[in-house]
Amino acid sequence: AIGGNKLKKFPTILFKTNSQVSALGLNGNGIEEIPKGTFSASKYSYMMKTFDLTYNHLSKLPDDFNGKNMPFLYGVDVSNNRFTEVPTGPMDAATLTVYAVRSQRDENGNRLLRKWPSNISLCPSLRQFCIGGNDLRKITDTISSYIIVFEIKDNPNISLNLSNVCNMIKAGAYLLIYDPEQDIRGCDYVK
């Protein structure tokens, strides 16, 4: 882990030199960009399993930050950055199990992320999705029953229907982390 070192640039040297890295903790650095081609250029990027990119200044991930280059991705945390949309590249990794995109804010603390990712249902291995602390609005997608930990708290304008996972919530097989005042429909059990 090389977090908290005030790195402004992503350490591409790790991938240019074909380092065999499977977990990378770069939290709390202030990184603003990951250069395009970082992951497609390395013959060992396929070994990557876990990224902690929290508390940086990222607003996008390069196109090569995806399941094709990193097919064994297990967990990605990009919380506390500056994304206006959920980065979808990691979601095409067949093994992505944990994905966190909490609290996306600009430099003044304004919430940036309002759009629900349209391809979340195409990620069947995803079991934990944390998207709290944003400004999500009406979600019309059916919430995946594969996700068993779903964190949406601190989204004051959210509106969603959980009827398809309500029985799982009642049975204790689905952990919903939410605020009681949120507009959650289709499952009276959560009120």
Where are these regions (language model features)?
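Conserved hydrophobic position(s) of the canonical leucine-rich repeat
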Residues: 7, 21, 31, 48, ...
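Hydrophobic anchor residues at the C-terminal helix/turn of individual leucine-rich repeat
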Residues: 14-16, 38-42, 65-67, 89-92, ...
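Conserved hydrophobic beta-strand positions in leucine-rich repeat
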Residues: 1-2, 22-26, 48-53, 73-78, ...
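Leucine-rich solenoid repeat scaffolds
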Residues: 76, 129, 137-191
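Consensus "Asn ladder" position of solenoid repeat domains
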Residues: 2-5, 26-29, 53-56, 81, ...
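Canonical leucine-rich repeat
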Residues: 10, 34-37, 61, 86, ...
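Core solenoid repeat modules with strong leucine/isoleucine-rich periodicity
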Residues: 3, 10, 15, 21-27, ...
